[in-house]
């Protein structure tokens, strides 16, 4: 590959890195888990919806949830949705 081709490739890779959203790189893996209401009492909680790329409310049972369960939408956004 010529030096011009290498420079073009380097430029394209740099542009791709700049345009990739930071939030998707720093998001914990558990943010990809589905909402898990658990078997106990129903409480209003939040989870990160990986398909819609946003935090949503759901009815949480109060026990045995996965880590993608937050007390507030704001806490979910800080952890999974980025800024």
UniProtKB/Swiss-Prot annotation:
The keyword Cell cycle does not apply. Residues 1-24 form the signal peptide. The keyword Ion transport does not apply. It is found in: Secreted. Its main location: secreted. One of its GO terms (molecular function) is serine-type endopeptidase inhibitor activity. InterPro entries: Kunitz_BPTI, Kunitz_BPTI_sf, Prtase_inh_Kunz-CS, TFPI/VKTCI-like. Keywords: Disulfide bond, Protease inhibitor, Secreted, Serine protease inhibitor, Signal. Disulfide bonds join 31-80, 40-63, 55-76. GO terms for cellular component: extracellular space. Residues 31-80 form the BPTI/Kunitz inhibitor domain. Serine protease inhibitor. This is Stephenin-3.
